[in-house]
């Protein structure tokens, strides 16, 4: 539910656009695109330090709901904006506060679940994004159709009021329900259950999922920044996020089918339900087979097929273009696998993983900034040029993922060699530590049966 509301509050401007948002605030097309992109500027600037901070304070049960209350309040305030500048400020601060959620949620899951269980759990989390597009469209359809002029407020303003209030309500309800980390959570688990949770992580990699007491606060940052695998995956994620920018404009793309506001929002929901089901099935199979590259690639190829159909057909061909929207939405199944691949590729120490998750997720959001300007109204209603850009981004993503996979294959080969030499040649272990940008202590633990998922 946190994820659903996170993305609803982030993307509701796209639905508000259909019912006078631009006209009432006297926005140009470029100004509207800037309102979409400025959220990700705040997101990027303030996200990289959030997971390490959460790792240090160890109380996500309080940290995440507090952030949720604040971003819900900011969403409500968006409804009272009068011009471009006031809307720009609310969107910027919304990005700052929402930056706490995703890396924090990913990090919590990585503390409770083993690497062979993460794909399905991450997918359930990311289905919040997919369902938010469907659920948010249905809410918007009802609000925009029935609330116009109520108490003297435009329907799009009511959309921000209602969705922001829902966010704050669920945040307060969630406080007594959320756990902390396995080693310090107090609610909902017996001491035996906490020990079992910690032992599961011990079996997964060969050590408890806790930072060494001797490690300095900046150790995780240094280890993460010196691991060049992070930069490859970051570029891949950035290209993929740019390719997924159709999500921001999905109501606009659906409206090119030629229907009214209510019908458009209702038609925008089914592709995301399909995407959610596809993502769950794909992630379940990825966990079962312990394979990442192909499970991230084939949904992107399906998305490319959707782009090609949209480029090759005219707006009058409603059936083909609507099917293409299903294919495009389904490409999210590959993006989700990329995130689980990211987490499992930087397992220990937790401080390094926290920095890696936050850094890659934050900088990959530059793709959303760029993507906000890929879909100008002048390219409509066919958006051929826009589809050409996102198609190229998906191809780039696949090629970078192939490179990343080859690096992990080589790393697994080195780990196997180091495992055979373990206890005989300390220099081999030290070399492995240097190659994997980690400490000698962690390299020794990783030698004990650990392999990167490819």
State where each predicted segment sits.
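Extracytoplasmic
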Residues: 1-29, 50, 136-140, 239, ...
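Intracellular terminal tails of multi-pass secondary transporters
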Residues: 1-11, 19, 29, 175-210, ...
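Helix-breaking motifs and short loop linkers at transmembrane-helix boundaries and internal kinks
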Residues: 9, 25-26, 49, 58-59, ...
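Extracytoplasmic gate region of multi-pass secondary transporters
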Residues: 14, 219-283, 372
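Central cavity-lining transmembrane alpha-helices of secondary-active solute carriers
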Residues: 37-52, 269-281
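Conserved MFS/SLC helix-loop-helix module at the cytosolic interface between two early adjacent transmembrane helices
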Residues: 45-85
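Structural signature of the two symmetry-related core transmembrane helices
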Residues: 62-76, 294-309
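Glycine-rich segments within core transmembrane alpha-helices of 12-TM secondary carriers
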Residues: 119-152, 161-167, 357-370
């Amino acid at each position: 539910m946190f994820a659903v509301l996170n993305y609803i509050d982030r993307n509701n401007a796209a639905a508000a656009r259909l019912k006078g948002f631009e006209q009432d605030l006297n926005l140009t097309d470029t100004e509207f695109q800037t309102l979409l992109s400025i959220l990700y500027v705040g997101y990027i600037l303030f996200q990289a330090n959030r997971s390490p901070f959460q790792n240090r304070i160890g109380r996500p049960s309080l940290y995440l709901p507090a952030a949720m209350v604040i971003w819900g309040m900011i969403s409500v305030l968006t409804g009272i904006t009068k011009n471009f500048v006031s809307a720009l400020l609310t969107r910027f601060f919304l990005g700052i506060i929402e930056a706490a959620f995703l890396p924090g949620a990913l990090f919590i899951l990585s503390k409770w679940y083993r690497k062979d269980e993460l794909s399905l759990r991450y997918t359930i989390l990311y289905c919040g994004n997919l369902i938010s597009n469907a659920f948010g469209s249905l809410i918007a359809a009802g609000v925009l159709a029935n609330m116009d002029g109520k108490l003297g407020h435009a329907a799009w303003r009511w959309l921000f009021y209602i969705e922001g209030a829902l966010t704050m309500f669920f945040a307060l309800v969630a406080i007594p329900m959320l756990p902390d980390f396995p080693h310090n959570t107090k609610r909902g688990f017996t001491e035996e259950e906490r020990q079992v949770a910690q032992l599961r992580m011990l079996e997964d990699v060969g050590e408890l999922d806790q930072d060494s007491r001797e490690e300095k606060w900046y150790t995780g940052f240094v280890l993460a920044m010196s691991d060049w695998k992070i930069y490859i995956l970051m570029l891949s994620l950035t290209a993929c996020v740019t390719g997924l920018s159709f999500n921001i404009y999905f109501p606009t793309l659906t409206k090119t089918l030629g229907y009214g506001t209510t019908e458009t929002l209702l038609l925008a929901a089914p592709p995301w339900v399909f995407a959610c089901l596809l993502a769950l099935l794909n992630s379940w199979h990825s966990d079962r087979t312990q394979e990442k590259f192909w499970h991230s690639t084939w949904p992107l190829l399906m998305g490319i097929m959707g782009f090609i159909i949209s480029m090759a057909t005219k707006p009058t061909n409603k059936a083909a273009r609507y099917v293409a929207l299903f294919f495009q939405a389904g490409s999210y199944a590959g993006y989700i696998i990329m995130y689980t691949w990211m987490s499992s590729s930087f397992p220990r120490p937790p401080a390094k993983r926290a920095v890696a998750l936050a850094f890659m997720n934050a900088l990959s959001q530059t793709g959303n900034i760029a993507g906000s300007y890929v879909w100008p109204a002048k390219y409509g209603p066919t958006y051929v040029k826009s589809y050409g850009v996102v198609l190229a981004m998906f191809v780039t993503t696949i090629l970078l993922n192939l490179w990343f996979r080859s690096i992990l294959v080589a790393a697994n080969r080195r780990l196997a060699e180091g495992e055979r030499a373990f206890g005989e040649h300390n220099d081999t272990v030290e070399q492995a530590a240097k190659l994997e940008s980690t400490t000698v202590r962690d390299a020794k633990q990783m030698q004990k049966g650990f392999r990167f998922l490819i």
